[in-house]
Amino acid sequence: MANNDTTGSAGRFGARYGRVARRRVAEIEADTESATVDGDSVKRVGTGIWVNEETGEKFTGGAYRPQTPAGETVERSIRTAVGDDE
């Protein structure tokens, strides 16, 4: 008997485009749907524009994720620099 696993959001592509491409699409869509920043849920408004659903604050981030890896590195560096000055 066949395995009845759920296909996820990229299941709409069927057997097309390859396994890796479908997996990347599924990961991006999962990150976009369940995006949080500091515990608050955020929603994607446009390319790189996100809005905090609880406070209404708009901010920029990555195209598909609210925080990019480079942005997280910069934020960590700023926290370290500010912590050293005090």
From Swiss-Prot:
InterPro entries: Ribosomal_eL37/eL43, Ribosomal_eL43, Ribosomal_protein_eL43, Ribosomal_zn-bd
Keyword check for rRNA-binding: yes
Transmembrane segments: none
Positions of region (Disordered): 59-86
Residue pairs linked by disulfide bridges in the UniProt entry: none
GO cellular component annotations of the record: ribonucleoprotein complex; ribosome
Described purpose of this protein according to its UniProt entry: Binds to the 23S rRNA.
Quaternary context: Part of the 50S ribosomal subunit.
Protein's name according to its UniProt entry: Large ribosomal subunit protein eL43
Annotated organism of origin: Natronomonas pharaonis (strain ATCC 35678 / DSM 2160 / CIP 103997 / JCM 8858 / NBRC 14720 / NCIMB 2260 / Gabara)
Lineage of origin: Archaea, Methanobacteriati, Methanobacteriota, Stenosarchaea group, Halobacteria
